[in-house]
Curated annotation (Swiss-Prot):
The active site is at H248 (proton acceptor). Belongs to the FMN-dependent alpha-hydroxy acid dehydrogenase family. Homotetramer. A motif (Microbody targeting signal) lies at residues 351-353. Oxidase that catalyzes the oxidation of medium chain hydroxyacids such as 2-hydroxyoctanoate, to the correspondong 2-oxoacids. Its role in the oxidation of 2-hydroxy fatty acids may contribute to the general pathway of fatty acid alpha-oxidation. Active in vitro with the artificial electron acceptor 2,6-dichlorophenolindophenol (DCIP), but O2 is believed to be the physiological electron acceptor, leading to the production of H2O2. Is not active on glycolate, glyoxylate, L-lactate, 2-hydroxybutanoate and 2-hydroxyhexadecanoate. Keywords: Fatty acid metabolism, Flavoprotein, FMN, Lipid metabolism, Oxidoreductase, Peroxisome, Phosphoprotein. InterPro entries: Aldolase_TIM, Alpha-hydoxy_acid_DH_FMN, FMN-dep_DH, FMN_HAD, FMN_hydac_DH_AS. The keyword Signal does not apply. Its cofactor is FMN. One of its GO terms (cellular component) is mitochondrion. This is 2-Hydroxyacid oxidase 2. The gene is Hao2.
Length: 353
């Protein structure tokens, strides 16, 4: 069977994965309203193409935090890739390196950051951190990723507690009891070489903690999970270098805005002072184009990467990235945009938003 679009990969991945694994990957919070709206919100947006322009050459390249990538399509931090493919994040990293895009490696990866970077030593890697109550763990993790050449630290802010994911409960998947970590261990635990039980983020983290984290690293800090003007303005005030507009794929608090709907508010609030990215609901090249037109520097993909991994491992992830890049290339040509720099809000029919 030919897999021609991301929806094809989703259908095939569901056939290949166990129900427990599928429920974990696809799991949404509560009634799944935000999960579904992430997808539906893109369908509500219409494009205003411009014609009679020379689009014989299309350039999808852009930069994020000063690093060039081949397309504004990167990989979000998602946990436990070995659920989908034995080599897990190592295969994902190899595909990202071949595509020359950024891969944000999760705190809850199946392999250590050392193993993942060794598999793709030339890749552009950011690290996603769930701030831990034990600051020695945070400091140790920052030191490790700096030594490995990571280019940014992504702090997830929308998970002070785990969302109410009914699918996981129905599958009897107890994350804290059954999943072991390779990375987030205290210095004492790490000497044993044994995985440690899943460590949940600190529920007491606040804006006042950011200066301490900034004092530990030279890396730019990106906040993932911002949805409002107020928090975006606070991010700028605290010298944060970027924001990923995200609702955690609808896995945390249900009934919050779709990421693409929140994007305009955040972009307006930062007023060009820092870079803004988004994830949540991107499934086609049209979706990428809409996000860029509304001010995202690039988009990040979550679940579709796992679908590709489940279907074909490294090759599947690369195919997912290639399909989306090719779709974006086509959409740019059909809308009159020769480069990412030419994608602007003028492409969006605001009267229908």
């Amino acid at each position: 069977m030919s897999l021609l679009c991301l929806a094809d990969f989703k259908a095939q991945a569901q056939k290949q994965l166990s129900k427990t694994s599928w429920d974990f990957i696809e799991g949404e919070a509560d009634d799944g309203i935000t999960y579904n709206d992430n997808l539906a919100a893109f369908r509500r947006i219409r494009l205003r193409p411009r014609y009679l322009r020379d689009v014989s050459k299309i350039d999808t390249r852009t930069t994020i935090q000063g690093q060039e990538i081949n397309a504004p399509i990167c990989i979000s931090p998602t946990a436990f890739h070995s659920i989908a493919w034995a080599d897990g994040e190592k295969s994902t990293a190899k595909a990202a390196q071949k595509a020359n895009i950024c891969y944000v490696i999760s705190s809850y990866a199946s392999y250590t950051v050392e193993d993942i970077v060794a598999a793709a030593p030339g890749g552009l890697h950011w690290f996603q951190l769930y701030v831990q109550p034990d600051w020695d763990i945070n400091k140790q993790m920052v030191q490790r990723i700096e030594a490995l050449g990571f280019k940014a630290l992504v702090v997830t802010v929308d998970a002070p507690v785990l969302g109410n994911r009914r699918g996981n409960k129905r599958s009897l998947l107890d994350l804290e009891a059954n999943i072991k970590l390779k990375d987030l261990r205290s210095p004492g635990e790490s000497k044993s070489g044994l995985p440690t039980p899943l460590s949940m983020p600190s529920s007491s983290s606040c804006w006042n903690d950011l200066p301490l984290l900034q004092s530990m690293t030279r890396l730019p800090i990106i906040l993932k999970g911002i949805l409002t003007k107020e928090d975006a303005e606070l991010a700028v005030k605290h010298n944060i270098r970027g924001i990923i507009v995200s609702n955690h794929g609808g896995r945390q608090l249900d009934e919050v805005p779709a990421s693409i709907d929140a994007l305009r508010e955040v972009v307006a609030a930062v007023n060009g002072k820092i870079e803004v990215y988004m994830d949540g609901g991107v499934r086609t090249g049209n979706d990428v184009l809409k996000a860029l037109a509304l001010g995202a520097r690039c988009i990040f993909l979550g679940r579709p990467i796992i679908w590709g991994l489940a279907c074909k491992g490294e090759d599947g992830v690369k195919e997912v990235l290639d399909i989306l890049k090719e779709e974006l290339h086509t959409c740019m040509a059909l809308s009159g945009c020769r480069s990412v720099a030419e994608i602007s809000p003028d492409l969006i029919q605001f009267s229908r938003l």
